[in-house]
Regions:
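Domain-level signature for proteins that mediate thiol-based redox and metal-cofactor handling
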Residues: 1-82
Length: 82
């Protein structure tokens, strides 16, 4: 019997008022295409007030206001690898 390591759950919270759903969905697609076997889930969570946050489990790894905009897909993928 083999034991599988727990798979990473990623959540992307985006602002619906800012029309960032497509950006969020594209990032989710990029992650799922690259890490299809390593990820447990990628969840899109609608929000308001200019929010754009990416969390790995309970850890906030990207926040638009704090980190200055949106992550490049290359940067986001490197964060998953690390």
């Amino acid at each position: 019997m083999t034991t599988d390591a727990p798979k990473l759950a990623i959540s992307i919270t985006y602002c619906t008022q800012c029309n960032w759903m497509l950006r969020s969905a594209w990032m989710a697609q990029e992650l799922l295409s690259t890490f299809s076997l390593e990820l447990g889930s990628v969840t899109l969570i609608p929000g308001t007030g200019g929010i754009f946050e990416i969390s790995f489990g309970d850890e906030l790894v990207w926040e638009r206001k704090r980190d200055g905009g949106f992550p490049d897909s290359r940067v986001l993928k490197q964060m998953v690898r690390d």
